[in-house]
Amino acid sequence: QSEPAGPPQPYTFSYDNTDEYGTRIAQEETGDENNNKVGSYSYTDPNGISRTVKYVADAEGFRVTVETNEPGTKTSNPADAQIVSNAATDSYSPSPASSPAKPPSLAVNAAPITIHAVHASPVVHAIHAAPVSYATAHHVTPVIALSHAPLTYTLGRAKSA
C-alpha cells in the first residue's frame, strides 16, 4: 500500500453545460484542508424536469438532499437522504419532439409485369476425377539415447560339485 502524499489540499471545481438539445448538466464541489467536501450536481432535461443533489461529507458522515420535480416523486426521507419533490400531482406527458410519421407515397407508377416461360434443358457436363499425388520429404534426425547406468560384474569361480 502506498502512503498518503501529505495532508488534503483545499480545492474548488465546477462546470455548467447545456447541450444542443437543451439538456443542462452542472456540478460544483469544494474540499478543505480537513478533507471535508461540500457540493452539488444537477440535471435538467429540455422539458424542464430536473434533479439537484446537494451533499456534505465530513466527520459527521455523508448527508444528501435531493430536490426534484420528477413526476411520480414525493417528499420523503429514505435512508437518511432528504428528497424534496415539487412534482405536479397531475400526470406527466412530454411534448412530442416531432410530428407523427406519415405513410410513404409512391413516386413512380409500377411497370407492367412480363412473364417468360422457362423450359428445362439437359445439362451435359463430364466430371473426371483428377489424380491425387503427394510428394513429401521427411527428414528425420536420428535420436541416440545415452545414459550412464552402473554395471555389476561378478568375478569368481563356479563351485564344483
From Swiss-Prot:
Gene Ontology CC annotation, any one: chitin-based extracellular matrix
What region holds the Chitin-binding type R&R domain? 8-74
Tagged with keyword Protein transport:
no
Q: List the disulfide bonds.
A: none
Q: Where is the composition biased (Pro residues)?
A: 1-10
Give the source's domain of life in one word: Eukaryota
Region spans: Disordered: 1-44, 67-103
GO molecular function, a single term: chitin binding
UniProt lists compositionally biased (Polar residues) regions at 67-86
Note the Pfam families from the entry.
Chitin_bind_4
Q: Give start-end positions of Low complexity composition bias.
A: 87-103
Record keywords, A-Z: Chitin-binding, Cuticle, Pyrrolidone carboxylic acid
Q: Which residues carry this modification: Pyrrolidone carboxylic acid?
A: 1
InterPro entries, per the entry:
CHIT_BIND_RR_consensus, Chitinase_insertion_sf, Cuticle_Struct_Prot, Insect_cuticle
Purpose of the protein? Component of the cuticle of the tick. Binds chitin.
Quote the protein name from its UniProt record: Cuticle protein 16.8
Q: Which organism does this record belong to?
A: Ixodes ricinus (Common tick)
Question: What lineage does the source organism belong to?
Answer: Eukaryota, Metazoa, Ecdysozoa, Arthropoda, Chelicerata
